[in-house]
Amino acid sequence: MGLEKDLPPGEQLRALFRPFLEQLAASDLSPKTIQKHVDNMWALGGEFIRDLHSDSALRGKPVELVLRQMIEYGGPLLYHGGEDQQRSFDSTCRKFHRFLAKTAR
């Protein structure tokens, strides 16, 4: 499992992810498409925590700020995965970025 110090940023991520995932669940998207987005959000959380481990300076910054910068132009490069998976991941990250921008107003 993860480290104890990963719990607070993980909880903050979950709070940011939840409204987006709830909107997806209430949408007209197919269950398969919704599941792809859910899987991609799980991967985004993992990449976020991985970045915290590789760059400790990120721990001092607000989670939402780091996340927005991470997904501004798509998602970060996936640690594991092929081209198709990266495209799907980038699409979800762009969709999530638009959602965050819209709900911040």
Regions inferred by a protein language model and the residue ranges of each:
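Short terminal alpha-helical segments
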Residues: 1-29
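Non-catalytic DNA-binding core/recognition domains of DNA-processing enzymes
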Residues: 29-103
